Amino acid sequence: MKRMGDSMACENIVGVLLAGGKSRRMGGGDKCLLQLGGKTILQHAIDRATPQVGNLILNINGDPDRFSHYNLNIVSDDIGNFAGPLAGVLTGMHWVKENHPECKWIVTFPTDTPFFPMDLASKLYDAVSDNKAELACAASGGRHHPVFGIW
């Protein structure tokens, strides 16, 4: 398999920004549209994810028009009723199968954690390549972060 440093590997990965939650702990609304340092949290996530993948989509629930100015493919959960982040992962997989069947991997980035590493996708890709695994998730401080994953 090609190492992530190879541009072909990056081009064959679709990034899925996960923004489909209810934001219950923050009183509802779109967490990713909150401002942080003069940009939305979503824009911070877009800025970090874009150079790591060949294509980037935004997974949401609700009215897609509120995200239209981001110029991303916007995909609503295939499973209704705010089923959780795995519904966004599944939706991303379905979108890739339909729109980019040549891509073998998706990398998921939750939009409520915008300061993920700039080499996250490459580390995840290398983990699945080195271990001949079917998926990998991020870990730090002895804890797993499964929403940051390659699938």
Locations of regions flagged by a protein language model:
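N-terminal amphipathic/basic-hydrophobic helices that include classical n-h-c signal peptides
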Residues: M1-S7
